[in-house]
Regions:
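Substrate-gating cap/lid alpha-helix
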Residues: 133-171
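Conserved beta-strand segments of alpha/beta enzyme cores
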Residues: 45-47, 123, 165-167
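Residue-level recognition of beta-strand->loop/alpha-helix junctions
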Residues: 48-50, 128, 170-172
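Histidine-centered active-site loop/cap adjacent to the catalytic His
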Residues: 179-208
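A short helix->loop->beta-strand "cap" motif at the edges of active sites that frequently abuts
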Residues: 117-124
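Short, flexible active-site-adjacent loop segments at beta-strand->alpha-helix junctions, enriched
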Residues: 9, 52, 91, 130-133
Length: 208
């Protein structure tokens, strides 16, 4: 099976860092074997496209090419014969600077997926954002109100998946690190097991 994993820093494998937003921060990622998508590598051709700061529908003021809705046409056209696309997006859209409600974030995701479906007939799986924990200087500054948003997004994403016949994985209760937004190794393992189980359920007919 040809699988594209497309997402943000939790797809990239960002190691939680309480000083991650400071200008001298050293940003590191987990070894690939500790990332949630590694469990899919057996018997599958895997493409991983994760970028720190990637949003569904917003530009990032520090990093270029992080608006998925603006870049997806050129990105998705690079990949052929995809059977499954797994999207892990929405966390960055919860930042207080964007002022997006859960409904707006979900509508933006739906529009992004419609763009993707113009290029491919691949099955779609969406992973809802993990619950932002507003208990530290990072989340209190950049993610004010995001804990409630991520809780609501879980049901919004699930409803979208049901309406559009997408696969759905809840990321809500995965283990989160000290920065309140990034997965720990345990969180990656928890997610990897869920995704692998869902992928194993797919029959060839469902991939057409």
């Amino acid at each position: 099976m040809n699988i594209l994993c497309y997402g943000d820093s939790n797809t990239w494998g960002y190691i939680p860092n309480i000083n991650g937003y400071s200008k001298d921060a050293i940003i590191r990622h987990y070894d690939e074997k500790d990332c949630w998508w590694y469990s899919l590598k057996n018997h599958n051709k895997l493409i991983v496209n994760g970028l720190c700061g990637r949003c569904i529908a917003h530009e990032n003021r520090w990093l270029k090419n992080r608006n998925a809705s603006a870049t997806i046409n050129s990105e998705i056209s690079q990949y052929t014969n995809l059977d499954l696309i797994i999207l892990q997006l929405g966390t960055n859209d919860c930042k207080s600077e964007y002022e997006d409600s859960p409904d707006v974030i979900t509508k933006n995701l739906d529009m992004l997926l419609k763009i993707i479906q113009k290029h491919t007939c691949a099955k779609i799986m969406i992973i809802s954002p993990s619950k932002i924990i507003e208990n530290n200087k990072i989340t209190q500054k950049y993610y004010k109100g995001a804990q409630s948003k991520t809780i609501q997004l879980d049901s919004c994403y699930k409803r979208l998946a049901e309406q559009r016949n997408f696969l759905f994985i809840s990321g809500l209760n995965l283990d989160i690190g000290e920065d309140g937004e990034h997965l720990t190794k345990l969180g990656h393992k928890q997610l990897g097991l869920q995704v692998l189980s869902k992928v194993k359920e797919l029959s060839p007919a469902e991939l057409i």
